[in-house]
């Protein structure tokens, strides 16, 4: 099966089923006769904008055709606990296990103000393009993550 058809099936499954994680999604794809490696499924999910959302039942994977950037921004913002800076760098504290997603989100912004990010389990180190723009970059990060970061 080609990539476009596989990604179309992923969207269809996510719109019709409550899917808690990629393993569940892979199982549903297998039931539909689609065999896919976990790494391929992960790339597909990233490319089509699948995100983890928390609802009353816990976490689930969601896909929305309606402005996925806004949805991702809101979800990532919920995961951020604080944004603090010193003279040379910015530290973002997140919920446990969520730093990688926050760092990836910031990387996808492709801002020239951000030289790069390094993510651990619950901390993201943001390296600014210029230390002269630290306060401006902190505001930019807060605006792009959430209003209350």
Curated annotation (Swiss-Prot):
It comes from the Bacteria. This is Arginine repressor. The gene is argR. The keyword DNA-binding applies. Regulates arginine biosynthesis genes. GO terms for molecular function: arginine binding; DNA binding; DNA-binding transcription factor activity. One of its GO terms (cellular component) is cytoplasm. Pathway: Amino-acid biosynthesis; L-arginine biosynthesis [regulation]. One of its GO terms (biological process) is protein complex oligomerization. Signal peptide: none annotated. Pfam families: Arg_repressor (PF01316), Arg_repressor_C (PF02863). It is found in: Cytoplasm. The keyword Transcription regulation applies. Keywords: Amino-acid biosynthesis, Arginine biosynthesis, Cytoplasm, DNA-binding, Repressor, Transcription, Transcription regulation. Belongs to the ArgR family. Its main location: cytoplasm.
């Amino acid at each position: 099966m080609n990539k476009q058809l596989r990604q179309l099936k992923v969207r269809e499954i996510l719109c019709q089923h409550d899917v808690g994680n990629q393993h569940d999604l892979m199982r549903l794809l297998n039931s539909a006769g689609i065999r896919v490696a976990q790494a391929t499924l992960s790339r597909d999910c990233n490319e089509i904008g699948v995100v983890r959302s928390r609802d009353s039942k816990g976490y689930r994977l969601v896909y929305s055709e309606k402005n996925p950037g806004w949805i991702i921004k809101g979800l990532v913002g919920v995961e951020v606990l604080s944004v603090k800076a010193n003279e040379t760098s910015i530290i973002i504290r997140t919920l446990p296990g969520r730093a990688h997603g926050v760092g990836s989100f910031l990387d996808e912004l492709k801002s020239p103000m951000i030289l790069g990010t390094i993510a651990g389990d619950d901390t993201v180190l943001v390296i600014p393009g210029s230390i002269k723009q630290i306060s401006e970059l902190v505001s930019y990060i807060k605006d792009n993550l959430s209003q209350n970061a």
